[in-house]
Every structure is written in C-alpha cells, then in structure tokens.
Amino acid sequence: MELTRVILHPYTTEKTYSIRNKSEHETLTFIVDKNANKYQIREAFIAIFGLKPLKIRTTNRGPAKIRTSTARPGYTKAKKIAYIVMPIGVKVAVSKEEVEAANAK
C-alpha cells in the first residue's frame, strides 16, 4: 500500500478537539484506510509530517443507521479512525487555520 493513501484526512469533532487539548500529550485523529495497520500508519505519518509519533491507537467504526424518508433505513460509511499521540511539547498544525497561524508567527 502506498504511504500517500494510508492517511486520508483529519477527523475533527467536538470529542477529538477535547481529546487533543486534554493532556500534555497532543493527540491527533485521522481517518485512515480500512486495510492499514499501525505500522503503515506510523510510516505514513513520518513521511507526511516528518515527526515520529509516541503511540498509535486505531478503532473501526461500523456503518450506523440513519433515518430516511423511505421505509428502509440508510447507513453511513464504515471508517477506521487512528488516534496518534505525539511526545510532550511537540505540536503539529493539521487544520488550515493552524497552518496559517503558524506561518504568521
């Protein structure tokens, strides 16, 4: 699997924002390829950001039922989420606003 296709995009929700700012370790969350393992995620993160993560945790989210106007329920897509923990003091700019703020300094 190509390293550029392992990490798909950042995953930003209220929960991930609170996890990121909760402890002294910065925790980043990404949607990753369903077939990627932790070693491939680590190598892709190092290739993209140039930083070595402290720990990586993954979880698989299955499709969830959603309401539709028909009698049959709809489903969301299944996804794999990677929680990447960085060492103390290491900050990574993931969102567009963070990159612009870092460049302005």
Curated annotation (Swiss-Prot):
Could you list this entry's UniProt keywords, alphabetically sorted. Ribonucleoprotein, Ribosomal protein, RNA-binding, rRNA-binding
Q: Does the keyword Hydrolase apply?
A: no
Q: One MF term in GO for this entry?
A: rRNA binding
Whether RNA-binding counts among this entry's keywords is yes
GO biological process annotation, one example: translation
Q: Name one Pfam family in it.
A: Ribosomal_L23
> Subunit comment for this entry?
Part of the 50S ribosomal subunit. Contacts protein L29, and trigger factor when it is bound to the ribosome.
Q: How is this protein named in the record?
A: Large ribosomal subunit protein uL23
Q: Please name the source species.
A: Ureaplasma urealyticum serovar 10 (strain ATCC 33699 / Western)
